[in-house]
């Protein structure tokens, strides 16, 4: 991290945090889940989905899943998207909780010597992120 960026983060009054890959090292967990979720359509499709997901981090599953369904020739319906989203959530929750902290995050957030306000900004659905946060140690 450059000196300028370090100064900016250390002395800002408000710090906004993403979750996956910033607080918890959970990006790989979600890559595996997308690949597994669509594995019934074959390795060519599931590998394409994994690659797309990894190149488009931060994009909501609610945007990705309809696209991925279209790649499988599944009829994209609200009910179908919700079914895949629910399955995805079941696949990732515990693995995200169990994933390691990003190195340095806990020390930084624990020090808060400048009395900063910290705000979590994530594409993870509200109920899911709240459940994950409640179960973190």
Predicted segment positions?
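N-terminal helical cap/lid subdomain that shapes the substrate entry/recognition surface
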Residues: 9-19, 23-103, 114
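Short, acidic loop-to-helix structural element flanking the phosphoryl-transfer center
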Residues: 2-6, 10-11, 90-120, 126, ...
């Amino acid at each position: 991290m450059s000196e300028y960026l370090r100064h900016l983060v250390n002395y800002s009054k408000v710090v906004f945090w993403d979750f996956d890959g910033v607080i918890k090292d959970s990006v790989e967990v979600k890559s595996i889940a997308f690949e597994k979720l669509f594995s019934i359509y074959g390795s060519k499709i599931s590998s394409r989905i994994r690659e797309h997901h990894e190149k488009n981090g931060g994009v909501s599953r609610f945007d990705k899943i309809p696209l991925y369904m279209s790649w499988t020739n599944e009829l994209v319906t609200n009910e179908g998207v919700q079914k895949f989203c629910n399955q995805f959530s079941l696949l990732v929750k515990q693995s995200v909780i169990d994933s390691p902290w990003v190195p340095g995050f806990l020390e930084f957030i624990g020090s808060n010597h400048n009395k900063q306000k910290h705000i979590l900004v994530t594409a993870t659905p509200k109920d899911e992120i709240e459940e994950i946060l409640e179960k973190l140690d």
